[in-house]
């Protein structure tokens, strides 16, 4: 059994925020609280500890009271670079990731991913949702992985790889169906943020 205390949560806040006009998405307020803080509040009860991957506004993220680590791969290499930074610093056997703009993530996310890894003998686990037409949508930026995946991630990034799904598929991967697709909604634009503000 994968115990909660054996899992560290990593909030991915290292992106450019290009679809939000270059603003730092994790620090944009939703109902008066930064989005990354909403994500932290959802994830905290599910893990033994937390850390943040960020590449700018480091003092602001450090004020959240958890360790902050920057990418060790240059040029904003995407979420996998953030995952790499997290794995390099992770002090527990397992790490789970969530993007900073996912303030509605399921409260049972980590437990269900951990159960699937155990039940299927998998290495990694990611959620899957269904869109309005019933098509499967993988949510690979939410990923439970062992720290031992570090070497394969280094090799994949060194070879120029950037897609989470491709890297994840090179392992024994458990895909866990979640009914509430809205729980995985990312807030990518200021218009989407305003829409959620009025709900």
Curated annotation (Swiss-Prot):
One of its GO terms (molecular function) is metal ion binding. It is found in: Cytoplasm. GO terms for biological process: bis(molybdopterin guanine dinucleotide)molybdenum biosynthetic process. Disulfide bonds: none annotated. It comes from the Bacteria. InterPro entries: MobA-like_NTP_Trfase, Molybde_CF_guanTrfase, Nucleotide-diphossugar_trans. Its cofactor is Mg(2+). Belongs to the MobA family. The N-terminal domain determines nucleotide recognition and specific binding, while the C-terminal domain determines the specific binding to the target protein. PANTHER family: MOLYBDENUM COFACTOR GUANYLYLTRANSFERASE. Transfers a GMP moiety from GTP to Mo-molybdopterin (Mo-MPT) cofactor (Moco or molybdenum cofactor) to form Mo-molybdopterin guanine dinucleotide (Mo-MGD) cofactor. This is Molybdenum cofactor guanylyltransferase. The gene is mobA.
């Amino acid at each position: 059994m994968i115990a909660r205390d054996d899992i560290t949560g990593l909030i991915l806040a290292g992106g450019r925020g290009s679809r939000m006009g270059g603003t730092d998405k994790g620090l944009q307020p939703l109902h008066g609280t930064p989005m990354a803080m909403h994500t932290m509040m959802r994830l905290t009860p599910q893990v033994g500890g937390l850390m943040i991957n960020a590449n700018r506004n480091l003092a602001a993220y450090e004020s959240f009271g958890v360790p902050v680590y920057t990418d060790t791969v240059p040029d904003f290499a995407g979420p996998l670079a953030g995952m790499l930074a997290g794995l390099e610093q992770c002090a527990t056997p397992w790490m789970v990731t969530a993007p900073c703009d996912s303030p509605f993530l399921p409260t049972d996310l980590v437990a269900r991913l951990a159960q699937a890894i155990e039940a299927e003998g998998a290495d990694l686990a990611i959620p899957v949702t269904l869109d309005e037409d019933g098509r499967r949508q993988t949510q690979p930026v939410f990923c439970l992985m062992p720290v031992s995946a570090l070497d394969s991630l280094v090799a994949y990034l060194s070879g120029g790889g950037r897609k989470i799904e491709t890297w994840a598929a090179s392992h024994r991967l458990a895909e866990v169906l979640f009914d509430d697709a809205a729980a995985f909604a990312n807030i990518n634009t200021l218009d989407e943020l305003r829409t959620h503000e009025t709900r």
